[in-house]
Amino acid sequence: MTEPRHESGSAAPQRPATDPVQRQVNLLRDQKRNLDKQAAALASQNEKLVRLLNASRQEIVGLKKTLAAEAEPPATYAVVLQVNHGRRPVGEATGDGPVVTGPTLDVLAAGRRMRVAVSPLVSFGACEPGLGVLLNENYVVVALLEYERTGEVATVKEVVDHDRVLTVGRSDEERVLLLSGRLRRERPKPGDAVTVDHRTGFALEPVTRTDVEQLVLEEVPDVSYTDIGGLGPQIEAIRDAVELPHVHPEIFREHGLRPPKGILLYGPPGNGKTLIAKAVARSLAERSAAKAGRSRPEGYFLNIKGPELLDKYVGETERQIRSIFANAREQAARGVPVVVFFDEMDSLFRVRGSGLSSDVETTIVPQLLTEIDGVEQLDNVMVVGATNREDMIDPAVLRPGRLDVKIRIDRPDREGAREIFSLYLTPDLPLRDEDVARAGSRALAAEELVAAAVQRMYAREPETEFLTIGYRNGTSETLYFSDYASGAVIRNVVDRAKKQAIKTLLTTGRRGITAEHLVAAVDEEFHEQQDLPDTEDSEDWARLTGRRGDTIDSVHMASHRPQGEPGPGATP
């Protein structure tokens, strides 16, 4: 074979065995052999891991079955007293590091206090004091239950610390109880009712006292001063007492004058005392909203009906009064005005030692005085009382500094009755077409109806005489039905006229309220009132007339138509 030659004619040199390309090839072959060995080793390890994983899975399934079997009945009921997170036991040697115990629970089971372990199937984070749990035969917690749903109810008197409260239970027994996990989150306040378990020493859950809540809380009433008729001077006096301190607080501070803390509205029944109290609440809310730049008035009207607070158990009425004022303080602390309105105030706060009742007022009156005096530093709380027996209220309640402003709400006169009738007889009611045509407009026709009703109600005629009062000085006075008129009576008269108009429409087909309907309604209303009150006691009549009973010597009823005879009134 002819060897290749160079151009010069000499033979080509041989390539050495250590050529770089050959070395690279050999290196790659070595790496491949190593990778093959590693792959084989990994495959072997993977097979071992698969076998181990399958074995572990089977073992876990077996353990779960074992744990589940431990939770099967029979089991012991217990209550969690304390949750113990993992920590180093006190007095134990530390060695190379801290010795830590696992999470445990202190429980009370069958009267025994024990420290027990918690099953892995139970969420330890959900364990909290007061909660019910189940223990298996090895005293391991295997299930979480709920709080005891029954038990005695006690009232929180004082919060001792973050996990204890002082409660008052039956027979005024005071006990310090631990708070359950739920109550520790909700933070009970003095006056709150809670269920208690004296066996474990826990206050468990809050209880809503609907007997108090349903009596008191109401948003801003939708009653304004314009909705009240016939009480112009009284409303003006109330607005001066209530609104001026809020509209011009700097002037009052300059003169060293404090706003009044309370108002007493007294006078005959049915003349708008409750409406005035609601209007006061709305007025305060509107003034407060304007001052704070809020578009929507915000406030609260706590309407307390006196007789509903009375309770046969000693101390229960006082507790409810404390709860009411605590509610008022809580709302006032938000910067909104609160009106606490006591209707029928004489039923709660009678003169102490009068002997006219069971003397429960000996403790109720001091409780109210304490609460009113406590309102002194709250600018947003106003106490309003209403009564038609102001002479029966304890003088300590009425003194200046408590109920500062006292306003008598009298029966309406002729002009006042016209204003009240105008609130109920409005042009949008069904009116007779001929009456509207004769008057010229619906508004004028409604005014004519008002005039007819007022004329009949305030007529001084023999048939409208109600009774004759003889005084001890020898004089006498004849009272007419109009002397017993009130806003409630006027509204009832209008309602009677509306019912008569409906009956006329159903029987004759003629639509609309007429003056004849109103006149007949006035007569029927007053004749029904003729025998009320059914008494010869001058004290009762003095209360209705506004005269003092000690000046009245005799009362003689006027003689009118027999009871049950149809009232006068033209046929519509």
Swiss-Prot record:
SMART domains documented for this protein: AAA
Please name the Pfam families in this protein's record: AAA (PF00004), Prot_ATP_ID_OB_C (PF16450), Prot_ATP_ID_OB_N (PF17758)
Q: A GO biological process this protein is involved in? A: modification-dependent protein catabolic process
Which family does the UniProt entry place this protein in? Belongs to the AAA ATPase family.
Q: Which organism is it from?
A: Kocuria rhizophila (strain ATCC 9341 / DSM 348 / NBRC 103217 / DC2201)
| Presence of the UniProt keyword Coiled coil in the record | yes
Quaternary structure, from the entry = Homohexamer. Assembles into a hexameric ring structure.
Q: Which UniProt keywords apply?
A: ATP-binding, Coiled coil, Nucleotide-binding
Q: Per its UniProt record, what PROSITE patterns does this chain match?
A: AAA (PS00674)
Any one GO cellular component localisation term in the record: proteasome complex
Gene Ontology molecular function: ATP binding; ATP hydrolysis activity
Chain coiled-coil ranges: 21-67
What is the name of this protein? AAA ATPase forming ring-shaped complexes
**Where are stretches of biased composition, namely Acidic residues?**
527-539
Q: Which amino acid positions bind ATP, per UniProt?
A: 270-275
Segment Disordered: which positions? 1-22, 527-572
